[in-house]
Amino acid sequence: MSSDWDSVTIIGQKARVGGGGPRENVAKTSSQLNAARRAGLVVGTEKKYGTANTKSNPEGQRLTKLDATDDVVAVKKVDVSVGKAIQQARQEKKLTQKELATKVNEKPNVINDYEAGRAIPNQQLLAKLERALGVKLRGKNIGEPLFAKKK
């Protein structure tokens, strides 16, 4: 009454009972991989990845949801008021778009897109711009000083 349910397949060192078969090893170069294929060995490919330093991106989740639907949905763009606030704060600090871009480690055309209202909002970049310009760019009170003086 032996079935596939009862059998166990062992892969690796213990699979070679008696030590006769080829050893399991990792091919590091394409020549090693091709040699294994020519020899008729079983070749498996596994992707190694670590999840310790990665975090999920909610924007990516939203885009995946958009892919799943059949509806045509317009992509969110930066509001014009945010673009004007960036432009005014930048001019008050006497910065060019290029200088501001360098300050926040971005390309000048990205700053241009934000000021024109063409860019897709990126929370990390908006936070950098807020700190560099000292002006709120998210939530309520867009354009007000980041740290308003207390009364």
Curated annotation (Swiss-Prot):
GO MF terms, alphabetically ordered: DNA binding; ribosome binding; transcription coactivator activity
Residue span(s) of domain HTH cro/C1-type: 86-140
Keywords carried by this UniProt record: Activator, DNA-binding, Transcription, Transcription regulation
DNA-binding region: 97-116
Gene3D superfamilies: lambda repressor-like DNA-binding domains (1.10.260.40)
Organism domain of life: Eukaryota
One Gene Ontology cellular component annotation held by this UniProt entry: cytoplasm
Any matching Pfam family: MBF1
Region (Disordered): 1-32
Any one biological process term the GO annotation gives: GCN2-mediated signaling
Protein role: Transcriptional coactivator that stimulates GCN4-dependent transcriptional activity by bridging the DNA-binding region of GCN4 and TBP (SPT15), thereby recruiting TBP to GCN4-bound promoters. Involved in induction of the ribosome quality control (RQC) pathway; a pathway that degrades nascent peptide chains during problematic translation. Required to prevent stalled ribosomes from frameshifting.
Family statement drawn from the similarity comment of this UniProt entry: Belongs to the MBF1 family.
Listed name of the protein: Multiprotein-bridging factor 1
Gene: MBF1
